[in-house]
């Protein structure tokens, strides 16, 4: 059970933060401390500051691939950055400045890499973003959500004029032998993409099934590469919720087997860009 005094102290730091409150939790476990922090007392409004909760979970209760995972909770004005695996293997990703720490005793092993001091104050700042495609509009939205004024520039007359103007695009994680940094980054990006699209849909800016969807994605593999690909998949030991091997004809009338991503999907890039820019609100200048 989380310590009530610690939860109260961390919640106070969140309530008094002006822009972003960053919290480190070295022992996420089942997420009790995180849930307790979000479970505000009756009558207490959601804090205006964004809560960025960075946590380590060596033994997740549900199957999760190792590495960094991201969960956006706009209804709580919070983000969860969860590292699955031994925390010391992720020090490069976890090091930084934190406004508060859960489980201070357990966090001492990270004290060399963590600076427990308030992060940058939330004074109004202005940032220029170059490019008005998926990447640029997503960066702009992330900055605006932190209360930062954004000036968006693009060489074209309007947004989504380049590759982001394609009619449709597919998205799924990238799998490689040895689980390269690119693969780990793609998993994080994939999770972030799905959550970003879901958040925009909840705001009424996108419609699932019309602007995007996640019906699953089958990446076929040539017969001469099938055995090696299956061996790679077995070595990585990812949960089937992320990826599994599909035999020829199992999912589609094809003679090729392949990698099946059950949450893989498609999106209309231009609609995604438009939704991002609309969600930025008054903090965006184009």
Kindly give the residue locations of the regions a language model identified.
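SAM cofactor-binding core of SAM-dependent methyltransferases
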Residues: 4-66
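Conserved Rossmann-like nucleotide-cofactor binding loop
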Residues: 61, 135, 158
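S-adenosyl-L-methionine
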Residues: 61-93
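Extreme N-terminal leader/targeting segments of oxidoreductases
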Residues: 94-97, 103-126
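N-terminal Rossmann-like FAD-binding beta1-loop-alpha1 element of flavoenzymes
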Residues: 126-152
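Glycine-rich FAD pyrophosphate-binding loop
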Residues: 145-165
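Dinucleotide-binding Rossmann-like beta1-alpha1 core, especially the glycine-rich loop
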Residues: 169-251
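Helical element adjacent to the flavin cofactor pocket in flavoenzyme catalytic cores
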Residues: 259-286
């Amino acid at each position: 059970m989380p310590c009530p005094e610690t939860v109260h102290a961390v919640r106070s730091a969140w309530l008094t933060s002006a822009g972003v409150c960053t919290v480190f939790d070295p022992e996420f476990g089942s997420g009790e401390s995180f849930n307790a922090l979000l479970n505000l007392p009756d009558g207490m409004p959601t804090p205006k500051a964004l809560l960025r909760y960075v946590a380590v979970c060596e033994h997740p209760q549900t199957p999760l691939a190792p590495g960094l995972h991201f969960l956006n909770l706009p209804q709580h004005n919070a983000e969860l950055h969860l590292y699955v695996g031994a925390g010391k293997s992720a020090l490069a990703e976890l090091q930084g400045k934190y406004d508060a720490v859960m489980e201070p005793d357990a966090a001492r092993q990270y004290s060399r890499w963590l600076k427990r001091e308030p992060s940058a104050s939330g004074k109004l700042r202005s940032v220029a973003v170059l490019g008005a495609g998926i990447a640029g509009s997503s960066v702009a939205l992330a900055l605006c959500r932190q209360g930062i004024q954004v000036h968006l520039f693009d060489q074209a007359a309007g947004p989504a004029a380049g590759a982001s103007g394609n009619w449709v695009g597919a998205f799924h994680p990238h799998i490689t032998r040895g689980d390269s940094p690119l693969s780990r980054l793609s998993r994080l990006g994939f999770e972030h993409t799905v959550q970003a699209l879901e958040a925009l849909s909840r705001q009424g800016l996108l419609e699932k099934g019309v602007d995007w969807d996640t019906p699953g994605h089958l990446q076929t593999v040539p017969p001469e590469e099938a055995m090696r690909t299956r061996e790679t998949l077995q070595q990585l030991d990812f949960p089937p919720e992320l990826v599994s091997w599909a035999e020829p004809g199992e999912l589609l009338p094809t003679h090729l087997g392949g990698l099946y991503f059950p949450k893989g999907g498609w999106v209309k890039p231009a609609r995604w860009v438009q939704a991002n820019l609309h969600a930025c609100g008054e903090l965006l200048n184009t």
